[in-house]
Amino acid sequence: MADLYPSLAQCAIVATAFKILLFPAYKSTDFEVHRNWLAITHSLPVKEWYYEKTSEWTLDYPPFFAAFEWLLSQVAQYADPAMLTVKNLNYDSWQTIYFQRATVIISELVLVFALNRFIKSAPQSNKHLAHISSLSILLSPGLLIIDHIHFQYNGFMYGVLILSIVLARKQSTLLYSGITFAILLCMKHIHLYLSLAYFVYLLRTYCLDPKSVFRPRFGNIFKLGLGVISVFAVAFGPFIYWNQLLQLKDRLFPFSRGLCHAYWAPNIWAMYSFVDRALILLAPRLGLSINEEALTSVTRGLVGDTSFAVLPEVTKEHTFALTFLFQLLPLIKLWRSPGDWDVFVGAITLCGYASFLFGWHVHEKAVLLIIIPFSLIALRDRRYFSAFRSLAIAGHVSLFPLLFTAAEFPIKTVYTVFWLVLFLFVFEQVAPVPERPRIFPIVDRFSLLYLAVAIPLIIYCSLLHQLIFGLERYEFLPLMFMSSYSALGVVGSWIGFMVVYFTA
């Protein structure tokens, strides 16, 4: 790996220096969320962690992440003990800011380690491709925006996910892959959306004989079952003993929230909401009835029960059924391809797509659940890259509304555009020519046109709209345009990758 330049370590050092410069940048309410979790886990006994509600930002991550916060709090007391007081709401001394920002960077070493393992696990002929993909993840504008400005710990947890995926590459480490993924589920439950792909792959490849599903490997079944059950027992056992499992369920799965987040995530429901919004204007001419009570919801994107003015309502059951259906399709191929790692990663990616496109109350940040695993196989050949390109554009541009302050506008825009131009150009140059011809070569032209529209759209939504309409008029339009534009790219990418996946 000495000939791979620049190395992961070199890029990580330069990126760290840049991220340190961002310490004083804008931070979202998620910063206070994690400060409060530091205080809760440090100040209260474990059995009170999921009952504490002094702050509205209650602990709603699984126990292993709470334990991670507890570990951080043991060091935080030396930086500024005041940050660990539960009643010290919205406390953000410089010591607190620097400490919390630094923990994000340090925890990202897990991502660097996982990417290094990914490169080492690649066949010798593909190591340079794995290296390029790894650099694109390490320097991702998504992680920069969400983790190092907005504030979260996604780099750390996606490092655990990548490590689990890499461990699934060899039969000898499949057991550790399943256990690592179980640990990840006990850290952030959004990864449940990927669990069916793991279940099918581990069952077919590790628990059953690849040559016959009627020959179970009882030793492997026992080891995997014992390992996974042990992980969940350690995580949830104490809360079961304290009879707190229902309380954890209410915290981890707050289904009282509406279909759409305040800013529509770029998915099917964003397009559905956009069509509903357009039909409000056309309804009088078309003779359609309008639900007057829903007008506030469709224009403001409130977090409560989302209602539609013209189109039929969407229930939780609808979203669950659609998500399961579109996850089931790639799992059929995965079941029929035991031991095929590329098919496994493709199935993980498509499970991520299905949950993001059809899920209930999806956050725009969840687009990384697609981008990160897809990046690992985006350079398999140019057909994969063609499907990945519009996702990379749409997914990263859709994150811009997270940073709405003027000071961060040039940072997010210049960094993201530079990343897109650099890595999409490099990907285009190095992606191998596929053995089969591309079914829809027009997709490439669509991707280029889609990229060309991104820059003027960003300029309008971030600058021109306020100059034209002011701060009070049509304030929902920029978010609606950005969300709908991004949704078009994500959905187009999903359709393209579905075709590639099933014809590969």
From Swiss-Prot:
GO biological process: dolichol-linked oligosaccharide biosynthetic process; protein N-linked glycosylation
The UniProt record lists the keyword Endoplasmic reticulum: yes
Lumenal side: 1-3, 117-128, 169-182, 242-261, 364-390, 435-450, 501-504
Reactions accelerated catalytically: an alpha-D-Glc-(1->3)-alpha-D-Man-(1->2)-alpha-D-Man-(1->2)-alpha-D-Man-(1->3)-[alpha-D-Man-(1->2)-alpha-D-Man-(1->3)-[alpha-D-Man-(1->2)-alpha-D-Man-(1->6)]-alpha-D-Man-(1->6)]-beta-D-Man-(1->4)-beta-D-GlcNAc-(1->4)-alpha-D-GlcNAc-diphospho-di-trans,poly-cis-dolichol + a di-trans,poly-cis-dolichyl beta-D-glucosyl phosphate = an alpha-D-Glc-(1->3)-alpha-D-Glc-(1->3)-alpha-D-Man-(1->2)-alpha-D-Man-(1->2)-alpha-D-Man-(1->3)-[alpha-D-Man-(1->2)-alpha-D-Man-(1->3)-[alpha-D-Man-(1->2)-alpha-D-Man-(1->6)]-alpha-D-Man-(1->6)]-beta-D-Man-(1->4)-beta-D-GlcNAc-(1->4)-alpha-D-GlcNAc-diphospho-di-trans,poly-cis-dolichol + a di-trans,poly-cis-dolichyl phosphate + H(+)
TM region(s), chain numbering: 4-24, 96-116, 129-149, 151-168, 183-203, 221-241, 262-282, 343-363, 391-411, 414-434, 451-471, 480-500
GO molecular function, one term: dolichyl pyrophosphate Glc1Man9GlcNAc2 alpha-1,3-glucosyltransferase activity
Protein name: Dolichyl pyrophosphate Glc1Man9GlcNAc2 alpha-1,3-glucosyltransferase
High-level lineage: Eukaryota, Fungi, Dikarya, Ascomycota, Pezizomycotina
Gene: alg8
